[in-house]
A protein has these predicted regions:
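Small-residue-biased structural context
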Residues: 3-175
Length: 175
């Protein structure tokens, strides 16, 4: 059973179609792209047998610089446009809480399994937001509401740039 009702997404390459995202939500989608790159980098690091401490450092850095400010945007800017009891609102909050807990666990003590759980959850969470939550918002919110979201996102940008020097994910065997 997946935690907090998280639905895994299984699909073949033939079923994947690019999503035409509203310009109002594109800043969040760009950040999601960075999140998927994080997932790929951690998986590559695990595959390359990168030292757990190095993965912990990178995860902590990515949390502070990308995930935490991104969660702020979603929780303080998007969620007010959904009723607190809406299933998608509850799922977003629950998944954010679970990701936070995993990152705190990794910060204290981590093993490879913790990283696998984290990247699987982040990937599933991003897919939920892109394929369900954002589509719902685009279909149900007014142009005025969407513009308000966009303006708030512009006031609280998350830097979508990589400032991590050790590219452990590119190494054959990182130690």
């Amino acid at each position: 059973m997946a935690p907090f009702g998280i639905t895994p997404y299984f699909y073949s390459m033939n079923e994947v179609k690019p999503i035409k995202r509203s310009v109002h939500l594109q800043p969040l989608s760009r950040e999601h792209h960075d999140g998927l790159l994080f997932v790929w980098k951690i998986r590559q690091g695990l595959s390359n047998h990168t030292n757990i401490e190095k993965l912990k450092e990178f995860t902590g850095w990515f949390w502070r610089n990308h995930i935490k400010p991104h969660f702020f945007q979603e929780e303080k800017i998007l969620l007010p446009f959904l009723p607190a009891s809406h299933p998608m609102s509850l799922q977003l909050k629950n998944e954010h809480d679970y990701i936070r807990e995993l990152i705190l666990t990794i910060d204290r003590e981590a093993d490879r399994y913790d990283f696998i759980r984290l990247v699987n959850l982040i990937e599933t969470h991003i897919r939920f937001e892109e394929r369900e939550l954002f589509q719902y918002l685009e279909q149900h919110l007014s142009e005025k509401d969407m513009m308000e979201i966009y303006e708030q996102l512009e006031k609280h940008p998350v830097a979508c740039e990589e400032k991590w020097n050790d590219e452990f994910w590119l190494k054959e065997t990182a130690k």
